[in-house]
Each structure stands twice: as structure tokens, then as C-alpha cells.
Amino acid sequence: FDITHHLKFVKALHRPYRPGRTFDAQRVDYLVLNYDTLIESSLALGNFPYADGLEGGTVAWWNPETFQRAGLSARVLKLHGSIDWSEFPDEVFPRRVPTTVGGMDENRQIMIWPASTKYRETQRDPYSQLSNIAREILRPLHDSQRVLVICGYSFSDSHINIEIESALRETAGRLTIVVFYPEDELLGQLKAWHEDDVIR
């Protein structure tokens, strides 16, 4: 994969330096629905410390405490899983095992594929843990603001749309969404939110 654009993207988010101005770095939370590892790879290539819920290195085990570590530039929440996650017999939580590691015939990838059962699958761990963290992210404290930047999302996952809409309704204007949208006019879910006086 060519990660040139992803690397430029994360550098722009994490290093928005301007001559003569200092930058007070704040952690960026990535709520990722794609299965690839382009964001994680870009963060690593950019030397940005991040947590994705897995402890270890190339081979890793699930440990959500990694999200609470000090000094993180980013947290990456893979809400639908990842191409490098594997589930083993008698284990509830995923491990990161690259395809280059042999002798693991029993491992299998665990991702939430597009299907009518997608919502039900998100209620199991580790997805339910990731969803709970995402809910907290989307609900800033009363004395703060949050911006959710959405790129490459088609708004076709109803369980994701419900979470975004609930957060917009519950935060009384403290959550702003910025959507990179390919159409000239708003359609579907975005149009409904834009026309809703409580949300807008």
C-alpha cells in the first residue's frame, strides 16, 4: 500500500507548526472503520506514540489499559477490527499476529464484515470496549469542545450513525462534525442532521 497521503494527513494533524508559533500538542483520537493498518503505520513512520489497545510489538495481545497511557499522541480505535487481528481457541480477545508468523494454523482473522449482523457483533468484546471509549470521545466534558472530522465514510452503518446522532443531541453544541463529502448537496443522513434544529 502507498501510505504517502496517510502520512501527510497524520503529520498535518500532529505537527501544524507555523513559523513563530508554538504548538501545544493534544492527543488525536482516530475512530477507524477500515480494516487496514494505514493510520497505525503512518503514525509509527511519523514517530507519533499511539495506542491501539494491543500490548507488545509485531505480535501483541489485547490490553485496553494502553489507551490510558500518558504521553500518547494518538489513540486508534479499530471499531470493526483489523486485518492483523486474530482470535485463538479459548481466548475472548484478539491478538495481533502478522501473516509472516508461521505455525499458527488455528488463528483466524476477526473483523466485522458488512452484514445485517454487524450491530450484534459490535456488542461483543473487544468491540464493545472500543465502542464505549468512542462514546466517551464523542461526548466532551461540559467545559470543552470536540471536533469530529469524518472522511471516507458513506454513512451506511446505522449503528455508527446512531452513536454520532446521539452524541450530537446530548452535547448541546459541544460536538461539531466536519465531513469531507463528495456530493454538491447534502443527502440522506447528513441532510437529516442538517435540517434537525436540535442538532444544527
Where are these regions (language model features)?
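Extended, H/D-rich, highly charged conserved domains that either
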Residues: F1-D2, L13-W113
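Phosphate/oxyanion-binding active-site loops and adjacent basic polyanion-contact surfaces
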Residues: F1-F9, Y119-L130, Y153-I160
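Generic structural hydrophobic/aromatic packing signal, biased to beta-strands
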Residues: F9, Y30, V76-L79, A134, ...
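A short acidic-Thr-Gly-centered motif at the start of a beta-strand
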Residues: F9-A25, N132-D143
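Short, charged/polar micro-motifs that form catalytic or ligand-binding hotspots
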Residues: A25-V32, R120, R146, I150-F155
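Short, catalytically relevant binding-site loops at active-site mouths
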Residues: T37, I83-W85, R120, F155-D157, ...
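SIR2/sirtuin-family catalytic core signature
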Residues: T66-L72, S128, N132-R200
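Acidic, metal/cofactor-coordinating or nucleic-acid-engaging core segments within structured domains
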Residues: V97-H142
